């Protein structure tokens, strides 16, 4: 009779443990889904900011070209750099799906680090070029 109680208690403990493991797996998968959704939202926001930045740079380049008409060699070089930056930004938009496929095996932190490194690598030179272009134009006007 004691043996039956031992078997029954062992069975209850095993089933409780199995339920807790199953619940842990479900909560882990739910957490992964939430992290993936938040990462997609972040990518969407980043894509929107990049598109706004691209359109602003394109408008700025067109405005400079219309306002000044003829360009000096220095202005031409600055405009070429701005156009190269715009092309780099365009390539970022198209490579997002490819990079998403490449990074499926990485964990979420590694993915976030990859995108922030890419953004820093592109935004630094963009801001430098824009500030140099605006500074040069202000000097010419002033």
UniProtKB/Swiss-Prot annotation:
Keywords, A to Z, come to: Amidation, Amphibian defense peptide, Antibiotic, Antimicrobial, Cleavage on pair of basic residues, Cytolysis, Fungicide, Hemolysis, Secreted, Signal
Where is it mainly found? secreted
Protein known as: Maximins y/Hw
Range of residues in the leader sequence: 1-18
Q: Which GO terms describe its biological process?
A: defense response to bacterium; defense response to fungus; killing of cells of another organism
Q: Which residues carry this modification: Phenylalanine amide?
A: 68
Q: Which organism is it from?
A: Bombina maxima (Giant fire-bellied toad)
Similarity annotation: Belongs to the bombinin family.
- Give GO cellular component annotations, separated by semicolons: extracellular region
The cross-references to InterPro entries, in alphabetical order and at most eight, read: Bombinin (IPR007962)
Give the sites modified to Isoleucine amide.
141
Propiece residues: 19-43, 72-121
Question: What is the tissue specificity?
Answer: Expressed by the skin glands.
What does the record give as the function of this protein? Maximin-y shows antimicrobial activity against bacteria and against the fungus C.albicans. It has little hemolytic activity.
Entry keyword annotation includes Signal:
yes
Cellular localization per UniProt? Secreted
